[in-house]
Amino acid sequence: MSIIRTYTIGTVTDWLRAFALASFAITAYAAPYIPKEDSVVLEHLPVRPGDPVARELRQLRAELSANPRKRDTALRLAERYFALANAEGDPRYVGYAQAALKPWWDLPAPPLDALVMRAILKQYSHDFYGAMQDLAAATREDPRNARAWSWRAAIDMVQARYEQARNDCLALRNIQSDLYVAGCIAYLDGTTGKAAADYRALSEAFARSGENSPEIKVWVLTRLAEMSLRMGNAKQAEENFRAAYFEPINDQFLLAAYADFLLDQGRPDEVIPLLVDWVRSDILLLRLALAEKALKASKAAEHIEALRSRFDAAALRGDKLHQQEEARFNLYLIGNKEKALALAQENWKLQREPRDARILLEAALAMKNPAAAQEALDWLERSGHEDPGLRATAQRLRALKP
């Protein structure tokens, strides 16, 4: 598949970022690089020299260099870097965003716009407590701040605080559009046993909303695909994934979800052309390597070693931001079941999304140790999550003799 794509920098609605990050970005990146000096040359952006995005970033960097305390410029630059990190899967851009906010980063009560941006960057580094403190302060100061409520919902979802997430979504009712609110509630209810009803609700809200940007279309279609899978409808899921894929934007969250679908369907040959140009992104390189190993492709060993090097470097830094992905790497690419289980258990302490449960259940099954995944088994029953594959794995795990 090939399609001309664009980079969407600074245009993606915050709720789309928030819920997309709840799916992948919160769980999967290496630590962002933060320059120690303002004069450090960062990275040549992966866009064409004449691209308007590159021109805007150069201009913003020049403006901020001339006046580092100009908050409007700093925030615009941080936003652009953060959006680029989302589009490209390169966490270094989050470090650059944090560097742009340096004058406000350690203030106890920064201005509202800087406070919310700081929270967004904190959650990226898994400082969920710090991020929620900032977001709580933001919603106290401005109860109609949709951005802060959206990110609160995203973090509450990642940590399986479903009632709090529902309250966050409901706070958006008089602030944002019907599609906005439907998307928030569908993300919650689609995880907690109401996939069919919320598929209908989100589909109807999407149809009523009229013309939407490619970003909104991709987000909604990806969520509809995920809900289709939870209903056991692979055909419908693929239709939604493909419709999202052919929107003319880069979206690594869609690519990761679509690649997982293809891998689960036993179609690794379709994953390679999908992800071959995405080796900079850890989450996508992992899926590419899984496909290559399944096909015994020549690049598999190279990409497995690249991932091993990245995970080893993260361990030396004390970086624990990507334990779910590292667990999957250990279990399926290098066969270290013990380490996979330990990583999956450690990851579950902080993150309790369906994919976090999946790797914990699968690692425990590989080790024939149901007790090791008891918390994930309890979550599955308590949440009512419907995914047939997850429930089948749980059933196999429960069937093991103690």
Q: PLM features: what roles do these ranges have?
A:
Residues 68, 109, 143, 176-177, ...:
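Short coil turns that delineate tetratricopeptide repeat
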Residues 63, 100-104, 137-138, 171-172, ...:
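Canonical positions in the second alpha-helix
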Residues 28-113, 133, 399:
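N-terminal leader/linker segments that initiate helical-solenoid repeat arrays
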Residues 84, 88-91, 125, 159, ...:
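Structural motif corresponding to the intra-repeat A-B loop/turn of tetratricopeptide repeats
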